Amino acid sequence: MNTKRTLVFLLALSLFMTTVVSAQKSDKLPPIKYQEVTLKNGLRVIMHEDHSTPIVAVNVWYHVGSKNEVAGRTGFAHLFEHMMFQGSKNYDNDYFTPLQEAGGTLNGSTNPDRTNYWEVVPSNFLELALFMEADRMGGLLEAMTMEKLNNQRDVVKNERRQNYDNQPYGTAGEKAVALLYPKEHPYHWTTIGSLDDLTAASMDDVKAFFRQYYVPNNASLVIAGDFDPKEAQKLVEKHFGSIAKGAAITRPNVPTPKLDKEIRVQYEDNVQLPRLYMSWHTVPRFDKDDAALNVLGLVLSAGRGSRLQSNLVYGKQIAQDASAFAPAQEIAGRFQITSTARPGKTLEEIEKELNAEIERIKKEPPTADEIARALNQIESSFIFSMQSVGGFGGKSDQLNSYATFVGKPDYFQTDLERFRRVTPADVSRVANTYLTDKRLVMSFVPRPKGKEMPKTNAAANQQASVSKKEKTKVDSTKLPKPTANPKFVQPNIEKTKLSNGLEVWLVKQSELPIVTMNMVFKTGTTADPRGLSGLAATTSALLDDGTKTRSAVDIANEVQSIGAQLSTLSDDDYSGVRMLTLTKHLDKALDIYADVIQNAEFPETEVETYRNRTLVSLKQRRDNANIVANIVYNRVLYGDAHPYGVTINEASAKAMKRDDLKKYYSTYYRPNNAVLIVVGDADLKTLTPKLEAKFKDWKPSEVSPMSLPDAPTRDKAMIYVVDKPGAAQSVITIGQIGVERNSPDYFPLQVMNSILGSSFTSRINMNLREDKGYTYGARSGFSFRHGAGPFSASAGVQTAVTKESVMEFLKELRGIRGEIPVTPAELEYNKQSLIRSLPRSFETVDQIAGQLANSVIYNLPETYFNDFAVRVNAVTLEDVNRVANKYLTPDKLAIVIVGDRKTIEPGLKQIEGLGSSIVYLDAEGNPIR
């Protein structure tokens, strides 16, 4: 498996790091200017211009979620999220098809309070996105059929299996809300709802729910990006104006839930380690105490220096993890603390320490520094999130969120100010008010070996009939045509070289006051010595755990003091150190950044702490079928003698010494083996002297080029099974060794795989998900590396159709080779999709830095991105057929399946040519004898 260790400081409010610099309360956020109109039918339209990238986002929110359902009819809001992609009156076909051809990306989501849908497309396809959204708002029911409904019910059941039943601790959330909220409360059930309710629902039930809530007066539309508001308003009137207004919406009005005593429950799960959950009722989102409760969560658990981390995780080392957060919703909120026990430790020990920390913060308010640290990180997160116009959490999504829940799209500054008003006394007060003995204490413990796993609703429904989705011919000439294509030009790269040989690439982007620095080292995990797999990743992970002048806590606190993000990673072909900061803190950020890169010390205590935590993580990864499938698949393909076949394991983790880390670091972390990529609000002329001052003492040294052994060859296809008793799904991975990144066949392979399995509308996904209903999603892809990386096609499928799913995968792999010939229309569709999607990957500073990092790692031509469209357009049908037959060989495939052997084995044995010689492996890929 590809070993990675990324220390990413998450932007989510509940996970902000602690800092030490006082928040600058006078600072204002960059303004998000917008125009707003309301149509006669009640649709609220919000428009925000951002011409930095030639893309536009369309974002629609419906003020309906699972809380608008009633007992016995749960899951409707989430089901409609799926149904809205199945075709409507004027486009009765898969919703993704025209938008992905346009180079767009799209998605939707449902939570208890709202349902949202979004598209991000090249700016000349704005009318297409508006037409599609309007047609499903006004014409979904006219195209709804029982076949579509049954198909999407199957997809939802697969989603349940994949995201709940087949995940470690996956049912904790639904169990918690069922205990916290009474049966009559609309938060008593989760968004996915009851599968029994969905199965029992009639077409009339489903249509009635849609007519009530999916109406323009219960929706808001945001358009953000590169467009003309006057023209956009005309298009909105054209496509949405005739949709009928719905009846007035009645919002749920229920009493605030309360617990009158402590509730204690314990559940068994297929997990390695026990986990404790504590939950309390609090307040709704935007309540006067909401901000203080969020800050309480940050003080308790956000970052290495936080109270729970420093005590339970790094101090006493009784917990593998600990988190505290306040997930407030529209009509209620809660506070939750979660912690997983280390091996040999008990949940009783965990609970005792958690209780002590709760009592301490009640009696001892957090320091002013603790409060300020949280506020600085919050401020940064507001600005960092303004980079994207679309997607989840982008500007269009935020404008819609504020419009829906507070009635003011421009609530950004006001929202920040409510956090800035939080005092230490406020945090102590809310802890005393809400974290009482009237709480839910829920534990998940490992199921005893040999004990049968109880059947869930989803598992019990494994034999449900699978509905084939009906196919409808659509006249695509009725779709709006795009305006002229916007011209994409790759960003201008300024280059210089420091006195020690370090290359510096800079792309100036001044739309927002942020800068990212990405130091790319041209060596990664392929340099791991035999017997020390994981060395590169461990070296990377420990870079910021201590330098000659700073401890791990010092580094964390200083980074957080400026609201920055520092992360490290190691991949097959490279290692990297990234710092994202506000421009006003660039000098301080650079000081920390340069120190971590040049002066890592790998303190013995930190090495041992990391080793112990890694050994626990290695034990935990057996719980996750997807991780197991990845590890085993790569080992089956490459064996133990090739670096692509091995990952960190118990033996290598125990064998790794501090001297090994220092040797790897001193060998490969050299300026002549690196390129520093800087993107954002920075000037090369001003920055270069600062870089020279910080890096001048960093000395170059000879770095030998990496050489890879030849990958092993396969002489026949084989099925490999890893038994996971009681698994709710079978995770299937099928493939073979692929091709290196610098192959002349790179572009034909990209086009071929786009047709086969890299997008929602690909052959594999449309077959296994949309046509058969076997899975929540199926995909394929090449992992392009310096050496020949793996090709894989994969999906988590219903256990009952494991054999059938394998056969459909094989059918599609044979089909792309010629049994189901690629058509000229398929070829053109996928080429245009690839070409038109390129500008989206240059929107944020980190996206730009990531694209340039690929140029560094694989020595791509300077004009690579400008030439991208020409290279893709040059791919012919003959090219696609040639590479499919050259690189996909069905008679030599490795087929790895992680699932319930007892259930799936009889069917697998029936597969002609494969079923007679199944190999059985453990979770590390070792043969079971």
What do the PLM-derived regions correspond to, one by one?
Residues 8-18:
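Bacterial N-terminal signal peptides
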Residues 146, 153, 207-239, 439, ...:
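Non-catalytic, conformational "gating/processing" segments within enzyme and secreted inhibitor domains
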Residues 20-44, 228-268, 279, 310, ...:
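Proteolytic maturation boundary segments
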Residues 1-9:
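Bacterial N-terminal signal peptides that target proteins for export
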Residues 197-202, 206, 653-657, 661, ...:
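Alpha-helical scaffold elements lining the catalytic groove of polysaccharide deacetylases
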Residues 48, 53-69, 75-79, 93-139, ...:
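M16 family metallopeptidases and their MPP-like homologs
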Residues 134-144, 239-247, 355-366, 595-602, ...:
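A common structural junction motif
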